[in-house]
Amino acid sequence: VVHPALEPYVRAAQVRPEPHPATRSTSERRNSFRSEAVFVAGASQPMQDVIDGEIALGDRTLASRLFVPFDDEGKALVLFFHGGCFVMGDLETHDALCRRLATDTHMRFLAVEYRLAPEHTFPAAVDDAVDVVKYVAAHRGEYVRPDAALIVMGDSAGASLAAVASALTRHEGLGIAAQVLIYPTLGPEVVTESSHKYATGYLLELDHLRYDYRQYLGDWSDHTDPRVTPLMFDDLTGAPPAIVLVAQFDPLRDEGVAYAGLLEHFGVSVELLEAEQMVHGFLEMGAFVPATLAVVDDLAEHLHRFVQESLT
């Protein structure tokens, strides 16, 4: 069963499902997503410094936010891509999560926005993620010590972008120490046992995600492209070591497990973590489900140890 603190939300979702995204405007959905994310996240961790900035990538500029924790060890910079089904999300929706992870890991976090659908369809978000990874790798001294480890992280849709960017740049000598994939979505047509069991009533409605994939892909019809469906990569040799976090009652659970297995198949070191009794998006629900904070702390502990070992 789901965690007792989550039961009221799951029951409510089953009794009164969220309106189908086609019935609301994109701006309305984004505003609602932002308001709800900030509300359920709760109080923010204080930081030594929070610096809003921009990353110029030739023909486009992306908003960024650097989080510097009070006990920053200067050993790593975590580049973070937010979730939101490729349609929603921004620096505000994941501000509290980045702050807590920065505090718990003693690492700097750099959250970066990317172009969203439907205004910008595939491969705009992927191009942004890849270009941001390359830019930050080349300019890491602007954000942290030049010799610091670089980690690429994301949740949900952001985890898909983190996975793709890590895979596509794996032979470019960027010095990416790790990729951290938090309940990743890994394709528009992935069918698994968990996608059947938890397709509806567990806070992520699978048909809503499928709808957003259609918004994201636009006229792009090749779903076997690994940039769309990372599970289709035919070689991941040399990809950065990975931490993959999945939630027990998430329709995306099994595809996250499958991607961890695919990475391992190609010789990549993987730590697979499963959050029991949890649902998709639980990491951002600290205000109402305090048990989620323990999982955030556990993830941070794994990441901190991961970096310590990689630097020795």
Stretches found by the model and what they are:
Residues 154-164:
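Glycine-rich nucleophile elbow surrounding the catalytic serine of serine-hydrolase chemistry
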